[in-house]
Amino acid sequence: MMRPHTLVATALFLSFVAGARAADTVPITQEHPMTSHTATGPFDVKRAPQTLSGVAEHSGLGRMSLDKQFHGALEATSAGEMLAFSSATPGSAGYVAMERVHGTLDGRAGTFVLQHSSTMTRGEPLQSITVVPDSGTDALAGLAGRMVVDIAPGGAHSYRFEYTLP
């Protein structure tokens, strides 16, 4: 059974994610000598509240599993986990997440891991979603890049993935 603070953190996180805008991202700080590519498309996401560890039980954090299906230039599924926190100040929250993506990117098959670290300060969101270095496998070995998630007012999710491959 979920505790009330977990339900509150989960509900506030969902409102945080719904306020995400594509322009609110952290730029890539590394320069990649390879040619850059951009993949775009919609995706579906299922989130499910999970029980926190005993250590974090009274921390005010919320924990959720992520199950995504990407469409478009990235045809893939992903599975991951997220921790979220919402402060007492309305519109201020943050989350971190890790997800392993498995599928094809512009026809190249493999897996890679995305790392999320995003915040919202009094309603102003800032996203950072990057490929974990050296996490690409098979035809995606050497993948580097960042993803931007956009959530339309009706809740439809889409992505823009700027990446490089050797």
Spans of model-derived segments:
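Beta-strand-enriched cores of mature, soluble protein domains
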Residues: A23-P166
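Bacterial N-terminal signal peptides that target proteins for export
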Residues: M1-V8
